[in-house]
Structure formats: C-alpha cells, structure tokens
C-alpha cells in the first residue's frame, strides 16, 4: 500500500510530470534518432539525484541504483522514441483537461511518470531489495526493432529477475504475453521502359501488386487463444506516368502471439516470393524487423509478476486487470525466458495518429500505479 508520504509526493509533483511531457514533446525522436531526448533524460536524472547514469551504444539512458557486480536486477523501462518520422518539433497544445501532440501518450507521458516515480525512491536513498535499472530506452517503435530492449537484455542477461515496461493507454491493461512479428522490405525489379515504345514489357508495380494480391488470399492459421495477422503498410515505386516501372517496393509484416503460427506465416510469405522468382521476376527480400514471441519463461515466476500487477490495479482502482498479448519492449525479455509485463502509467487515445492526446486528470493514478509496482522492491 502506498504510504501517506508517497501520496503527498504524487500530488506535489504532478506539475513536474507535465513539465517533462512538454519538454520531451518539443524534442523530435524518431526511432534510431533519440539522441536529443536521451541527453535531456540523462541531464534530468543526474540533476535529480541519480548518480550512476549513462547513455549506452543503443541510445538507452540507463540509471543503475544499488547495482553490484553480482546482485539480481529488476528493470523498469519506458521508451523515448515516437512512431513519427518528423525531425522538427510537432504541434503541441493543452487545455485544462488534456495535452495533445503526436507521441504524447505513446510513450512520452509513460516515460515522464516513470521518471518522477523513480525519483521518489532514489532521492530518499531507500534501500533496495535488489539492483534496479531505470531505463529510458530507444527504438521500441516500428523499424526500431526493439533495439533498446535487446541491448539491456544483452548487457545484463540472466541477472535480470523481472522486467517491467511502461507503455499504453489503459491503467487496467496488463500485457502478459508477446506478439511476435517479421517485417520485410520487398523490392521488385523488371525491365520497364517507355509506356508507349516499350509497351508489353513487364511493369514492376503490376508484379508487386500481384504479390500483394497473393498475400491477401492467405487464410491465417486458426488456434484457440491465438490471433495471427498480416499487413502491407507501405508501397512505393515508379518514375512517371509515361514510364513502365522498373522498380517497386513494399513494407509488409505478419504477426502472431504463437510461435507455430508465426512459422506458418513465414513459410507462406517465403513460398510466395519464391513463386514469383520462378516466373522470372527479380524479387529482393530484406528482413527489417524480427520481434520474437515469448520464450520458455518459468510460468510460476511469470504468474507471480502478473499477480503483483493485478493486485496493484485492484488495490488502487477497485477494478480487475485486463490481460492480453501485445508487441512491446517486453517481447525481448520474454523471449529470453525472463518474466516480463507491460503496464500503462497514462491514459489517452489516438496513439500513432497526429490527434494523439492524454487525460491530465489520470496522471496521478498513473503515478500511483508506477510507484506501487516500484515499492515492492524497496525495504519500506
């Protein structure tokens, strides 16, 4: 249970959370280009009592608290990147009830809440039951391919006992399993030519369209409790209206929360590409994203972690958690056999759109949940 001092701290520091959100929203951070946000977070952590802070090669801001060479570790993480490619500040506005900006909830508000929550324990130099890593991580979105989370698991590996990531828009939702995915950039090349003089030559756009049509004939595997999907998200190519296209490309993906179904999709996609090669079409396939499904996590330990989140939601909000699968930074530890969940410390809507927003009156509740989960690892 949160102490009176913790509740007072939350009430007194909501404006700090809002200030961090405003500051971060003014700093563009597409995946792989989070340098400026990372520097902001590093400076903030150091100015607020965190002594062991660094930016690693993956652009993660890693704050180590009472970490020794041997003790077990628990990770608390929220990502700095946004799904948007913009390299100039995006529009931001707020009123008494909401803030509006691309990326304001996913994951800026979650990150701000995590930062201020962690500060409570660190500034008071409270004794931890294990080593703690507070991480503002890179590359969660899109073709970031979970680079930041991968680096943390690579660097700390089997020492990590449990792993939390803050992401999402619903304080009751607990992501309990991983949705894996494979993402491809597929490029088709043909002879092309002048639209009149070379009429009859193969058109790369037509060939790519035919591949897409074949993909969309796929009947996804059916399995109880499993959802499998596919999507073509971007297509581009051609030269001009009077040119038979020599080159066209697409970005496509498939997803599933089941490893066997993910493998079924892989085989179908690869057979499709090979079939068009057999027809004399040049098809280049580049794997640009590989997010694993869950691995062999000790079920009892994962259940205990989920139960801890369920208990916090019940205690704070008098409600039951909503469990489900998703693709988050938790994919990587789960694939490595580490108990991991994703929870939200903010409430909003419109994620991945330019109309994204957060509810300001829910920031205290997000901070309560975040601090309640962290509290378990301190001797209070």
Spans of model-derived segments:
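Active-site metal-coordination/substrate-binding segment of hydrolases
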Residues: 70-136, 156, 365
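Acidic/histidine-rich catalytic neighborhood of metal-dependent amide-processing enzymes
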Residues: 108-179, 253
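A non-catalytic alpha/beta surface segment that caps or lines the substrate-entry region
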Residues: 20-23, 29-71, 91-93
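Acidic-glycine-rich active-site phosphate/pyrophosphate-binding loop
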Residues: 80-95, 160, 176-187, 341-342
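Active-site nucleophile and cofactor-binding loops and adjacent substrate-binding regions
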Residues: 53-55, 103-107, 322-325
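N-terminal capping segment at the start of a domain
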Residues: 1-35, 348-352
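Acidic, glycine-rich active-site loops and adjacent beta-strand->loop/helix elements
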Residues: 80-82, 98, 135-143, 166-170, ...
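Metal-dependent amide/peptide-bond hydrolase catalytic core
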Residues: 1-5, 185, 189, 193-200, ...
